[in-house]
Amino acid sequence: MTPPAPEAGPARRSPLLAVALAAALVAAMLGLGRLALRERAVAPLPGHRAPDFKATRIGGETLRLSDLRGRVVVLNIWATWCKPCEEEAPSLERLYRKIRSGPLGRDFEILAVSIDARSRDAVLPFQRKFGLTFPILFDPDGRVSRIYQTTGVPETFVIDRQGSIREKVIGPREWDRPELVEWFSGVIREGAAKPAGGGRPG
């Protein structure tokens, strides 16, 4: 008499399937954990080297952050739909004009990186409305935001002459307050006394 065929079904396959799924889940979690640790380790913070990037200006030219090495750079990440960004834009322009019109002007720059998806169509009316004269760059795919690991807009990074992040500011500021204008002037003068490629700020 032929013995009955063994029952095929989930009872025999389930343990193996469960083990395989568990192993895959553990591997994925370990991989994500390593990625998260790696991202935290390179998060740009004050004292760290500012990550280089390139982006397109309104006129179509490509600009790299490293092209401005030797200047103090205010990197402002913003969007036209952001109300706090709109509130601080006039004071950024006033700060720009005050310092650029003085003896330290050639050593100072503001880069405003827009994360607007529509880029030029959204930014041009904003630029005209507030009479912005500093360079505006487009980051519609969010690459610069990811590099700098921003959590919202506006976020601003002050980068010294040596290319290191001096300060990180989350949220809007009244950028042309007298004490801030003097602080920026001090950072520019301080950097001028150091050779290019010198140490990071303390």
Locations of the language-model features?
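N-terminal targeting signals for export/organelle localization
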Residues: 1-52, 178, 199-202
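Conserved helix-turn-beta segment immediately C-terminal to the redox Cys motif
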Residues: 71-72, 87-113, 128-129
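Thiol-/selenol-based redox modules, centered on thioredoxin-like
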Residues: 31, 155-202
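Short, ordered coil/turn segments that flank beta-strands lining enzyme active or ligand-binding pockets
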Residues: 58-59, 161
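Short active-site neighborhood of thiol/selenol oxidoreductases, capturing the structured segment around
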Residues: 63-86
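Short, internal strand/loop/helix patches
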Residues: 111, 116, 124-162
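Short loop/turn microsegments at loop-to-beta-strand junctions
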Residues: 50-51, 73, 153-155
